[in-house]
Amino acid sequence: MLSLKITTHIYIHATPEQVWQVLTDFKSYESWNSFIRKVEGKLNIGEKLKIRIHPTKQKAMEFKPTLLGVKNAQSLSWLGHFLILGLLDGEHHFKLCSQEDGSTCLVHSETFSGLLVPMMRNNLKSIRKDFEYMNQFLKLFVESKL
């Protein structure tokens, strides 16, 4: 199989707008984000971002994905490639879903595709934990600001 999807979610006791404010404040990432330590770039579709991640079971790495989508207080997505298109691609998504009680469900996912997915499946699966940690730290950070 040449694709793998990792999906996590968490409920945050804050509005989507409040979560969005923190999620898109890239300068604050170093103070709360355990996984994505640095993001440089603007929130414009087509923009090349510069992202530094620190997976718990791998070395830190930097990559330059292209911003695919930005919907204020709703969703954010980018697409990155390892070396060349089709070798190992990752489409990263954050989706903010408003709940009836005024809270937010964050759906945090990535779909990996390409020729290297079968060989890297176990390494890629370990990223689920990093997403879960990041989600938890985001929740704590957002809720502490209320």
Segments the model singles out, each with a brief description of its role:
Residues E40, K57-S103, T111-S113, L140:
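Hydrophobic-ligand binding "helix-grip"
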Residues V39-T56:
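Generic amphipathic, hydrophobic interface segment in small proteins and small subunits
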Residues M1, K27-N33, P55-A60, L83-L87:
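Short, solvent-exposed secondary-structure boundary motifs
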